[in-house]
Amino acid sequence: MTTATPAPRRKKGWMSLKVTKIEEETWDTKTFYLEDSVDSGCPFDYIAGQYLTHRFDKIGEKPVVRSYTMSSSPNQAGFTALTIKRVEGGLVSNWMCDNLKLGDEVRALGPIGKFCFDPHKMRPHLVMLGAGSGVTPFVSIVREYADKLGREGAPKQMTLLVAYRSKLDLISWPDLLALNKVPGVRIVTTLTREDARSEGFLHGRPEIPMLKEVLAGTYADSSYMTCGPEAMMEQFVDFLKSQEVPVEHIHLESFGN
């Protein structure tokens, strides 16, 4: 007799999440830790890479809705987290970084999204490319599977290429340093506006020469995910197609403001 897998926990409709902790990631980025406003803890189950849709009623004359990928991972019990980077002219991102404080409540709907590792459809080597705040889903994914590599339902190997402007913009850097020490995890960081090659960084945008170097030998057994600026993602997809990677093994996520 088999035991049925319990259905994921999920609240119907809009829920209220309370800010329980705020971390300064960089000069323009903050991570907000959220728990259920009534019962504490994380009130839902989710898959690394999914997002929440949030409604803000006090920013303007009309309610404003935005979606943000969770930067926390399901294996981190008791909370969920959003990592918010200021966007020039971005109404919500700037308001959150300037005004959201401990004890405030945020309305949320979800979790939602399919930008996740799917063991039934993806190859065993997961290769990811992110830039700036586009690293957040990948921090969640790498953290979730780092201690499960090779097990059922997890990739066997993970490679993450992430681009930042400078060392002042290193979002989730302590996590990435720790995760890069895990066997089977490879994290490569490039800085586009600062040359720190003497410290182990690459230098420049993740364009064709860099992609050839970092992704060499991955094309036959890998699935690819990318999140960041549209131009970067388009070039990444075109490059993978030139290497005869099937389109079903290329997955994209686009961030708005």
Regions found by a protein language model. Give the residues of each.
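Short, conserved phosphate/pyrophosphate- and ester-handling motifs at nucleotide-, phospho-/glycolipid
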Residues: 49, 134, 229
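Reductase modules of NAD(P)H-dependent flavoproteins
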Residues: 9-13, 157-257
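Phosphate-handling active-site elements
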Residues: 146-157, 247
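Phosphate- and divalent-cation-binding pockets in alpha/beta enzyme and binding domains
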Residues: 116, 137-140, 171, 235-236
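Ferredoxin-reductase
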Residues: 4-104, 124, 164-166, 190-194
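A phosphate-binding catalytic loop at a beta-strand-loop-alpha-helix junction
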Residues: 125-141
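A short, basic/flexible loop-to-alpha-helix module at the beginning of a structural domain
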Residues: 110-121
